[in-house]
Amino acid sequence: MIDSLKNKNNLIALIGASNDKNKYGNKILLDLISKGHNVVPINPKEDSIAGLKSYNNVSELSEKPSIINFVVPPNIGYQLTKDLVESDYDNFWYQPGAESEEISALLDSKNKNYIDDKCIMVEAKR
């Protein structure tokens, strides 16, 4: 999955993107944009973030994301993951602090690819 970051045209859906510059949902979004990645913010409380249209959920996207990146608390991430694993999404990435044993067990039971021990900002090179 980390290899898919090398192709900057691959779509990354960022669940928990934020306009709050103090939150990692903002820092990660701006970092990926600055590195030339194709990223869309997912946040039902925002219309736009960093000048990009914000979507309420991943299912609203017209293109299937290559990676769904989570920067939300584990309890929220788990609820969203429960819905997403039943759809045709394969690659899930949980930022440090967004992961949980419950999420990992769910993803393992559905044979989904996931990363829960690395920061996407570190792994996404310029």
Please name every model-derived segment.
Residues 1-5, 117-126:
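C-terminal helix-to-coil terminal segments
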Residues 37, 87-91, 110-112:
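A short helix->loop->beta-strand "cap" motif at the edges of active sites that frequently abuts
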Residues 96-123:
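Rossmann-fold NAD(P)-binding glycine/threonine-rich loop
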